[in-house]
Structure formats: structure tokens, C-alpha cells
Design a protein with these regions (language model features):
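Short, surface-exposed linear patches
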Residues: 19, 48, 87-93
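Sec-dependent signal peptide recognition
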Residues: 1-7
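Exposed beta-strand-loop-beta-strand "reactive/processing" segments of non-cytosolic proteins
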Residues: 46-87
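C-terminal partner/receptor-binding element of secreted or periplasmic proteins
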Residues: 28, 91-96
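Short, non-transmembrane alpha-helical segments in secretory-pathway proteins
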Residues: 19-54
Length: 96
């Protein structure tokens, strides 16, 4: 009975869920690069507002990720800065 339960659970797990893990790791690495290079500046801009920087990512390919840094308040997310991140060369630059 337990084997049947485990088999049915494994059957319904989408195979795409495993493929997205690599993409999530790349996006997390890109966000960490932005935080490492620009995090203190963003925190200083928000000092006294009781807000913290929040990050969103857009995966382009295994090397390039776009990152938006902003704030989330009362159901609204507002972007402060956009970054172009090259994970392969560990570089992050502000987008113009």
C-alpha cells in the first residue's frame, strides 16, 4: 500500500519541476551578486522608511539574468533599480 502511494506521488510530480532547479540556482546567484555589489547602497536609500530592498529576477539564459531591486508595500511592488547580471563572469551592472 505504501509503495502504491509513493509511486502515485512520484507519477504526479512534474518533470519540469526538476529542470527549473538549475534556473532558480542561477537566479539566486545573480541576486546575491547584486546584493554583494549594491546592497548597502539600496539599504542606505531606504534608511528611515521602515522598508527593505526586495529583489525580482528574470532568467534570460545560463549566464544572463535581469534583476530588479525595489520595495513591496501594501500590495504594490515598486522598482528602484534594474541590473544586468552575468553569472558566468560574476559581474553586475546598473541598466540605463
Amino acid at each position: 500500500m505504501i509503495r502504491l502511494l509513493i509511486a502515485s506521488i512520484l507519477f504526479f510530480i512534474p518533470l519540469g519541476g526538476f529542470a527549473d532547479e538549475k534556473q532558480r540556482e542561477i537566479e539566486n546567484e545573480a541576486i546575491n551578486l547584486v546584493i554583494k555589489k549594491y546592497g548597502k547602497g539600496l539599504e542606505n536609500r531606504l534608511k528611515g522608511t521602515e522598508l527593505n530592498p526586495n529583489y525580482r529576477s528574470w532568467y534570460e539564459n545560463d549566464c544572463f539574468v535581469s534583476i530588479a531591486a525595489g520595495t513591496f508595500q501594501e500590495g504594490t511592488w515598486s522598482a528602484m533599480e534594474w541590473y544586468s547580471v552575468n553569472v558566468c563572469s560574476s559581474s553586475a551592472e546598473i541598466m540605463d
